[in-house]
């Protein structure tokens, strides 16, 4: 049984065959899926999916590139959604300096990142963290969050092995997806080799980040076995052990998911 901790089935790339795709991946052994909001609109669609399918759970939040969606009114709406029993995390939230270089934009990202972390603390929910080209600021903010007993996962991890181990020391999990199968993913392979298996979560970020041999195509959760096989190869263990351990990790973090 595979636990997919980061999907975007609300994405428009699934609009023509969304239900068929979700049913297919479930039949292929993906027993639990967290669909992750990235904007107010996608969070609404995420919640609709979690109402429709008993194996899909919702993460509610606004991605740093979509913080124009956030004001006190929409933030209050987000707070209300954290009370729903099928909301299992706040996310995806964080910092993305890849596109946004302006200091005032980055400051606004940090402001709403911290506000959404406070939301997670209020609701006793874990967080799903997006961080791109913002390693130091993210680490500083998450170090403070750990002091408030906020738990979570660093999604689609892309920084150094050393920083990953620092996150683990703070109590966070590391999300690993299709990138680990890429030929140029030496840094991530090294990170996985150094991480304890009991701190890794499986994810796709679908429809993005399809693993080899499907790189460049629309991704979905049925591709997770490629990620499992690669992690098993790196760690010198069996795919079954990777599947079992990462599933247990996900249940340990996302406590509102029915086990």
Q: Can you name each region flagged by the protein language model?
A:
Residues 1-259:
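Mid-domain alpha/beta scaffold segments of enzyme catalytic cores
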């Amino acid at each position: 049984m595979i636990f997919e901790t980061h999907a975007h089935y609300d994405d428009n790339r699934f609009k023509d065959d969304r239900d068929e795709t979700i049913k297919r991946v479930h039949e292929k052994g993906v027993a639990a899926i967290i669909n992750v909001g990235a904007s107010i609109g996608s969070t609404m669609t995420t919640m609709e999916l979690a109402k429709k399918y008993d194996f899909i759970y919702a993460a509610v939040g606004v991605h740093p590139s979509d913080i124009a969606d956030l004001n006190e009114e929409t933030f209050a709406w987000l707070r209300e959604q954290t009370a729903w029993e099928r909301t299992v995390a706040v996310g995806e939230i964080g910092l993305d300096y890849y596109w946004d270089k302006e200091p005032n934009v980055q400051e606004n990202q940090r402001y709403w990142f911290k506000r959404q972390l406070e939301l997670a603390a209020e609701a006793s929910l874990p967080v799903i963290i997006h961080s791109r080209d913002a390693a130091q600021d993210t680490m500083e903010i998450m170090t403070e969050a750990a002091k408030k007993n906020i738990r979570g996962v660093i999604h689609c991890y892309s920084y150094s092995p050393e920083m990953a181990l620092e996150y683990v020391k703070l109590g966070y999990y590391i999300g690993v997806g299709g990138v680990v199968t890429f030929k140029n993913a030496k840094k991530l392979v090294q990170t996985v080799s150094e991480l304890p298996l009991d701190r890794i979560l499986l994810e796709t970020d679908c429809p993005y980040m399809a693993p080899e041999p499907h790189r460049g195509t629309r991704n979905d959760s049925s591709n997770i076995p490629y990620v499992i096989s690669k992690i098993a190869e790196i760690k010198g263990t069996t795919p079954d052990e990777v599947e079992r351990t990462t599933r247990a990790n996900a249940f340990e973090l996302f406590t509102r998911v029915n086990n």
